[in-house]
Amino acid sequence: MRRLIIIINLSLIVAFMMMFADCSDSSNGRKQVSIGYVNWSEGIAMSYLAKVMLESKGYDVMLRNADIAPVFVSMAAGKVDVFMDAWLPATHADYIRKFGDNLEALGVAYKNARMGLVVPSYVTIRSIEELNEHKEKFRNEIIGIDVGAGLMNETERVIREYPVELTLKPSSGATMVAFLQKSIENKEWIVVTGWTPHWMFSRYDLKFLDDPQKQYGDAEQI
């Protein structure tokens, strides 16, 4: 799967280079490209890969890290040239509706992306519907990621619609994984907002909780 993802992204980078042909020049005469990224594992990997490949072709590349909303605002304003981690058609639909007239989709880096609530495999429940009866084991909380992330917005809706009697705790992608790792080391129950592709699924034995209401929707594309 890693090889496939890299091949797809190399083809996208060729598209980037064609698009960036008219980018502004830096003081040394090299074309400048600005890549926005959020602290999500797959986006970091793709952005740094693009940086290396573009620099090998003579571009000056600046990586700009921000939360998801400022990234879209910066793209619409022309301050960021590309963002490689947009989840469509659902998760980032609000941003596309708001800024889409100023944006252009170049291609798909990953198909069948998924998001939802994730637990270690030793947790015995299978479904979101079972969370409430075991909420004390989960300390009455769901460990989330960045405020404003599409996954967080979707999870807030999941909590309302089921409903779920646990509180969504914002953090960051890295902090969420740190909480997950500590709980696994101690064989404690934990539920987090998770998604694939993400390296944590290859490092830890995890599972998505079933979503019988399909609140998180179908597979998406990045």
Predicted regions and their residues:
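Bacterial signal peptide processing site
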Residues: S24-S26
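Short, well-ordered beta-strand elements
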Residues: G29-E42, Y59-R64, R139-I143
